């Protein structure tokens, strides 16, 4: 009978023979590995691809397979996340840490997917700015804060913001908000819209220009 060592819920054999490889009932993409008739661990099909019944295997080999499987599972978790939308590398790292993934595995996955261009902070920053410009216009200051929170470095943020049309963004925001204070005297209306745009991070010179433009555009035509 081979010696056995157990840790993290897995029992590893110092040396044993693979006696069965069976697909898991609930997840046929994973394989249960049995050594000398006893369950040892479960592996992704791709990780278990080189194993065969009757093969002798050591504890260190099983530990390497277990590590490869952890990396595979973390990678698959990230790929499912990326199917929703792009994410920055820092967002991915935080996401995996929340799922108790080891730091070395996190770095391995990020490096692998960055090399494959599936994680790309430059592309993510451009995507984020374009989405905001299309659906929820923001000032450069607000966009910079959002990208900083997502862990994007300053140089990448600056490049992504270089083409932002802040005047157009402020105009669209002002047009959307203008009706909230319809009927107020001009001075009060201007003050409210000015404060609102300033809170959104737009520079005063742009705010002043846009407030006047939107006020005039909302006045009834004189006959």
Task: Identify the role of each PLM range.
Residues 10-223:
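An alpha-helical, amphipathic repeat domain used for nucleic-acid recognition
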């Amino acid at each position: 009978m081979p010696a056995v060592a157990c840790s993290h819920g897995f029992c590893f054999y110092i040396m044993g023979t693979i006696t069965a490889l069976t697909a898991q009932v609930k997840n046929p993409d994973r394989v249960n590995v049995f050594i000398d008739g006893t369950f040892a661990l479960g592996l992704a099909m791709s990780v278990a691809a080189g194993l065969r019944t009757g093969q002798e295997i050591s504890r260190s080999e099983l530990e390497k397979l277990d590590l490869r499987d952890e990396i595979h599972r973390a990678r698959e978790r990230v790929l499912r996340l990326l199917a929703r939308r792009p994410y920055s590398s820092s967002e991915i790292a935080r996401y995996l840490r929340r799922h108790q993934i080891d730091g070395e595995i996190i770095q391995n996955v990020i490096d692998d997917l960055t090399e494959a261009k599936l994680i790309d902070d430059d592309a993510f920053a451009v995507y984020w700015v374009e989405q905001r410009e299309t659906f929820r216009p923001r000032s450069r200051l607000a966009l910079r804060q959002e990208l900083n929170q997502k862990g994007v470095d300053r140089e990448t943020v600056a490049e992504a913001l270089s083409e932002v049309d802040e005047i157009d963004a402020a105009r669209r925001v002002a047009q959307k908000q203008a009706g909230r204070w319809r009927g107020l005297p001009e001075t009060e209306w201007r003050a409210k819209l000015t404060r609102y745009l300033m809170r959104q991070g737009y520079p005063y010179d742009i705010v002043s220009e846009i407030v006047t433009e939107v006020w005039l555009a909302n006045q009834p035509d004189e006959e």
